[in-house]
Amino acid sequence: MEYPFWVNDFDRIKNYRDSYPLSSEIFEQPQSFWYGDNPKKPKKHMEKSIRRLLNRALPQLPILVMYNIPNRDVGQYSKGGAATKERYLDYVERFTKGIGKDSPIVIYEPDALPHSTHLSEQEKEWRLQLMKESLQMLTDSCNGRFYIDVGHSNWLEPKVVAELLDKISNPKVKGFSVNSCNYRTTKECI
């Protein structure tokens, strides 16, 4: 990278370091910022939130995470996501407007790709098509550096991951990410 990942300045408001001294190492690490969709908030809220974050992070590189795929986490702990394809594509459009001409790292939909293997064949094809369509929208509409999340090191065989990536990727996607929502060690993931 030509510049370091942004480390959030949480401490400037709440003085967390003094309140939680054992956690100070955590505050010194880059953190990602997760964006889903909150129907209770005005539609422009996410766009403004992303713009504010990108402006605060300059000149460093923030990491954003998109996390709103329909049937997110296939009904497990983080279930939810957009209710319909249309709602999801609206979310994608608002996300791209938030990024604008900036180039943050964006982790695309943690666990959505490996979870597709837990769906019926029809649901799997629907999800993969939605992922392909939304990635095309994203890479055509903004300068984000997109990485498709492929789960963790103990989930799918590399051959299966490669086959799934072939179905949804496009040349503008920068690569893939691992372990975005798990607790595997770096050593396990390499």
Where in the sequence are the language-model features?
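A non-catalytic structural micro-motif
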Residues: 134-145
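Extracytoplasmic/secreted cell-surface and envelope-processing proteins
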Residues: 72-76, 114-118, 155-159, 184-188
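N-terminal carbohydrate-binding/catalytic regions of secreted carbohydrate-active enzymes
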Residues: 2-98
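Mobile, glycine-rich extracellular loop/lid and propeptide segments
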Residues: 63-69, 84-89, 98, 104-115, ...
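Structural recognition of alpha->loop->beta junctions
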Residues: 89-103, 163-176
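Structural preference for beta-strand elements that scaffold enzyme active sites
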Residues: 32-33, 59-65, 103-107, 143-147, ...
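Catalytic alpha/beta core domains of metabolic enzymes, predominantly
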Residues: 171-190
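Distinct, well-ordered alpha-helical segments
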Residues: 119-120, 124-134, 156-169, 188-190
